[in-house]
Amino acid sequence: MRQLRGKPKKETSKDKKERKQAMQEARQQITTVVLPTLAVVVLLIVVFVYVATRPNTTE
């Protein structure tokens, strides 16, 4: 059957599998890239605040 110009084509099972695979890879990247980066940023902020607010011990 001919596809009408304005309508999107129906998703095939192959397209669905590819989309699921892409979503799985995106989730994998979140755990391997985003979380460690976020942890480093939080750690840097904590260290900066600690250094900035510690009492001076110069005599």
Swiss-Prot record:
Query: What keywords would UniProt list here?
Result: Coiled coil, Membrane, Transmembrane, Transmembrane helix
List compositional bias (Basic and acidic residues) regions by residue number: 9-22
Q: Where are the transmembrane segments?
A: 32-52
Q: Which gene encodes it?
A: smco4
> What ranges does the record give for the region Disordered, renumbered to this chain?
1-25
Give the protein's recorded name. Single-pass membrane and coiled-coil domain-containing protein 4
rRNA-binding recorded as keyword: no
Q: Which domain of life is it from?
A: Eukaryota
- Does the UniProt entry include the keyword Transmembrane? yes
Subcellular location(s) per record: Membrane
